[in-house]
């Protein structure tokens, strides 16, 4: 379920694009420093959003600079990081490893097994640093796997479990913002779960794999767009309750536009036909 919480680059200003890229590069540097080349290869924009959000909410001291790297050996890239960058890197590594485990369990992909083996040392390190988070991730993914294995009927248990996983990831402190962060992250998690289900619907139907929309009798992922917009509205409502000033427009771009990028790329022709 990686790759949904991304920016709509075409609607960003040049300054916003540079900011987004610098935080992304900062996360990549943290992954490489803490978890090696395998960790850096698991880099996602989803955790870039988490870094931006936590930094916007808590406004910690930030470090920045420019440096070359394996991906950009010629031209130095601007980077920015804060105390939340290392945390997001750890969560990125854990989630990437769990994703490889799930791909191997579900489809026996050799590539997933190989990537998982490379990520395992880093994931173990991250789990040692954040044992409660690692346990929560494993528990939520276990609930999802169990619910998906039980095909007796439609259930929102997997979506709720993924929402709980996101709520745990987004909670880094126990303070007055904790409840709001958890509500927002839970809403975002449910949106991502069902959006992923919509995008995977046809492939899952062909392979005979679990998909909640199949159990609802949905013929095409595009048909589920109205329900997704309701879920997106719930997430947006919770986000707007947070006292976000720093990078507010960038975060809004991701939530209100970027998060739809993959869905619209998959279903735009169908949506235009239905309009």
Feature-to-residue mapping (PLM):
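Acidic catalytic motifs of isoprenoid enzymes
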Residues: 1-183, 190, 194-229, 237-247, ...
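Short, flexible loop/turn segments with low-complexity composition
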Residues: 248-252
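A glycine-rich phosphate-binding loop feature that marks nucleotide/adenosyl-phosphate handling sites
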Residues: 253-257
């Amino acid at each position: 379920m990686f790759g949904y919480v991304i920016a709509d680059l075409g609607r960003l200003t040049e300054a916003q694009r540079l900011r987004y890229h610098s935080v992304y590069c900062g996360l990549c540097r943290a992954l490489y420093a803490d978890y090696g080349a395998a960790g850096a290869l698991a880099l996602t924009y989803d955790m870039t959003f988490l870094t931006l959000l936590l930094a916007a909410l808590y406004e910690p001291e930030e470090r920045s600079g420019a440096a070359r790297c394996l991906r950009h050996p010629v031209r130095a890239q601007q980077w920015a990081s804060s105390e939340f960058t290392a945390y997001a890197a750890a969560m990125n590594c854990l989630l990437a490893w769990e994703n490889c485990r799930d791909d191997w369990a579900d489809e026996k992909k050799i590539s997933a097994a190989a990537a998982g083996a490379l990520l395992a040392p880093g994931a173990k390190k991250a789990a040692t640093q954040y044992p409660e988070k690692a346990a929560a991730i494993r528990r939520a993914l276990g609930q999802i796997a169990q619910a998906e294995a039980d095909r007796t009927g439609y259930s929102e248990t997997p979506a709720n479990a993924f929402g709980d996983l996101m709520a745990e990831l987004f909670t880094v402190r126990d303070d007055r913002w904790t409840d709001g962060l958890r509500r927002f992250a839970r809403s975002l998690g449910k949106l991502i779960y069902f959006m992923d289900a919509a995008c995977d619907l046809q492939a899952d139907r062909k392979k005979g794999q679990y998909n909640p929309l199949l159990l609802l009798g949905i013929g095409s992922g595009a048909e589920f767009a109205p329900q997704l917009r309701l879920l997106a509205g719930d997430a947006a409502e919770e986000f707007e309750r947070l006292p976000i000033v720093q990078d507010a427009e960038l975060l809004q771009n991701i939530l209100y536009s970027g998060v739809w990028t993959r869905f619209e790329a998959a279903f735009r022709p169908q949506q235009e036909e239905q309009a």
